[in-house]
Each structure stands twice: as structure tokens, then as C-alpha cells.
Amino acid sequence: MKLLCGRRVIYTDVEEITDGNVVSVLQKALAIHLQNRAEIDYLYRYYKGDQPILYRRKEVRPEINNTVVENRANEIVSFKVGYLMGEPVQYVARGDDKAVAESVTRLNDYMLSEDKAAKDKELADWSHIAGTSYRMVLPDGEANVEEDECPAEIFTLDPRYSFVVYGTSLGTPAKMGVKYVLLEDGTLLFSCYTHNHFFEITNTWNIQRSEEQILGIPIIEYPANNARLGAFEIVLPLLDAINTVESNRLDGVEQFIQALMLFHNVDITSEDYKELREEGAIKFKDIDPSLKAEIQYLTAELNQSQTQTLVDDMYDTVLTICGMPNRNGGSSTSDTGSAVIMRDGWSAAEARAKDSELMFKKSEKEFLKLLLRICSDLGDLELKLSAVEIRFTRRNYENITEKANVLIAMLNNSKIAPQLAFTHCGMFTDPQIAYNMSMEYAKEQEQKALELASRQNPDGGNGGNEPGGQKSGSGDTGGSSDDE
């Protein structure tokens, strides 16, 4: 069994990477990266279904050797990615500045044109499989073809062919981003980016290109967590055990059907046995009255119910460790909505998703720094990073009725500010936006009500609205007006 404990972070103590030391830094980094690459490749093949059970060998009755892959690794990654990235990541303006809000809307339009939602999904796939992923952003040379074209291009890199080298100083800043390709002639071509330089190096350690650049390091790492552990990496022994048990169950059924025959006190030749297998019957007699002849099957059937209990227990453990909901949970007439959410593990799934959000946002801010710089240099979009907030828009429908009741109760309490009600009811992914939209809607409704009232009573009096009231200027109504 392969022991996997997360990916290694690549460090260098070089203060500045130059033509004189870039090859040395690359060689040392590549040695560590190749270890990571071998593990990532193993995890990726495991995710696709190429798992150790397919290569098992049996010494006893090797002709009965079923290999069953229950690809729970694929299930774990698919759920995690779907739950985290089911809805596109959005950029939201901080504050009430309309100019900033319009610029952020334009930034979201840029991301839509670049199909960033699909590329975020690719990033999340690699993060949950390999424990880390990489994104690259470069200026788009054809960005002026259309006005709404994003001035930058976004790429999702294969973590088996890319890595980032960090410094050992305080904060471990990124020193160099590397991606490489295998050419048809078998040569490896490395593209190395530092903060102010670009190098192109072959695996013969010749620097083919060396030129200055002002963009910075366009390769950003998106680790899944600090240990860079994949989503199913920590339960690999359990997943292998489930495969083994399921394969052995099929072996047990097949061995029961193809049971061995026991000949007790029966003298049988090879030809007689072949005839038995072909005809399905045999004639024999006792050798001696005291030595009874007997032919029977050697059978020992596997207890399927106990085996299923073992499989269910291991699967439940996998779900608990990975923070996934149990879709086969029991039910009770006394369960409340909150109890079901807690019991079936949906609260744990949400907690893990929020943990992944924090790691994603940290790297996404580095990506935004480069993106906003490109948009400023090549376009007319001027935005500060501090004016943009990254929002995950997962649909928050769990226990929605109870949350709505809490919101109504808090809004009806005159001692609670409405903004606090929106923030703490748990109903909205972005309480501030929901509050602002609701306040604008309430003002619009008040304005419409005033306009409707003024149209119904253009003179501003109350007489026409009262039962039996008369129009102004007639009868007693006019007299009372004169007295006033």
C-alpha cells in the first residue's frame, strides 16, 4: 500500500533568481517536484478507477479472482467539487460606490467571456484529487477584437507539469513559477517566471531565452489545504479495504458454485473424473462394508449479512472523515429540520466547504492582483483589490422555512436593527447585498403607495375617502372649511 501524506512545498533560500543561479534553483526544485508528480499521477489514476485491487494475485484457487472497483474516490471528488463550485464564484463590490459597482459588474462580464466558472471547476477538480492546483493568467494579444473581450487569458495548468518555488523568508513569498512541456523529440522545455524575468530552459540546462517582464509571476498555486492533501487521500486504506471485501464477496459466491468435490473411500481415475464432469454423474460402490464410500462438495458459504455490515461501517467511516453527508441515514417522525441536517452530515459538508473557500480566496486574491493590473494596463478598467469581494453563491436552502421565520421575527422586533436580522438569520449567502436590495425595494413600494394615494385624492383632502363624505365646496363641508 502506497503511503501518501500530502504534497511537498518547494522552497529556495536564494534572495533573487538570476541568469547565474536559475538553473541551480530549477534543478533542486525539480527533484522535489518529481516526487510530488509521481504521487499526483497515482492519485489521478486512482480517481479514474485504476486502483490496486485490479492487480491483486491469489495463491489459493487463482482461477477465481474477481476484482471489483467501487470508485468511491470519484464519488468523493464529484460531491466536493459540485457542492463547492455548483454555482459560479462571483465578484461583489464592497461599499455603496456606484462607479465601483459598475466596474465590478464589468469584471464579472469579463470572467463570463473567459468561461471562468468552468476553469474554476477544473481547479477544484485538481485540488481535491491532488491536494493542489495551478492557474496561469497572461495578457490577451487579441483582446481588442471586441469591446467586451477580457484583456487577459486564464489557463488551468496540470499540476504534474507545473509548480511554484517559494522563498524561506518571512511569509514565504513566491519566487518562481514553472511550467514545462514534453516536446516530440523527448526534450523537456521549462518556462520559468520570476517577478521581473522570464527564462526558457531545456533539460540539458541550456538557457534558450532570458528576457525581462513586468507582469510578475503569472502562475498561482491553489492548495486545497496547508498539508496539500487530496479529498480522498486520507481514506485510501479504507477505500482499498472496501474494494477487497467486495471482490472477496464475489469470490465467495463463485467458489460456492464451483465447489471442490471430496471423494471419500472412492477410487477414481483421471478419466473417470473427466467423464463425471462431462456427464454429471458417477457410479461407485463401497470398497468394504466398514469403509463407506462418499462423494460430496466442500462448501463453506460466506456470511453475506455480516460482510455487508462491515462494508457499511467502512463506508460510513469514509463519509465521516471526508465530511460528506450520509444519504442513507435513518428517519424519525420526531426529527426536526435541524436534527436531520446535523444527523445526516450536511452541516459537516457545509463546514468543510467553508474551509475550502478560505483557501481558495487566499489564492484568488493573488490572481486578482495580476488580473486587475492587466485590465488597467491593457484596458480602461480601474479597480483596487480592496474594492472587490469574492463570493461563493451556493444555494442555501437547508431549513429555509425556519430561517424565514427567524428573519420575520427579528424584523418585527423594534429593538433589533434590520441589518442585524439579515445578517444573523442565515438565509442569505450575501446578507449585505440582500439588505441593500430589500431596502431599495421597500422604498420603491412606499413611493408607489404615495403616488397611488395622490392620484386617488389629488386635492389632498380626506373627505372623499370617508364613507358618506362630500366633495369640497358643497353643503356643510364648505361651511366648515370657511370656519377653519
Describe the role of every protein-language-model region:
Residues I400-Q456:
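Charged substrate- and nucleic-acid-binding regions of tRNA-handling and nucleotidyl-transfer enzymes
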Residues Y435-E484:
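Extended, compositionally biased alpha-helical segments that mediate assembly or anchoring
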Residues A117-W126, R249-I257, N303-I400, L411:
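C-terminal amphipathic alpha-helical
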Residues Y11-V22, A29, D140-N144, H264-G280, ...:
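Charge-rich, acidic-biased intrinsically disordered regions
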Residues Q208-D344, A348:
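Extended, charged amphipathic alpha-helical segments
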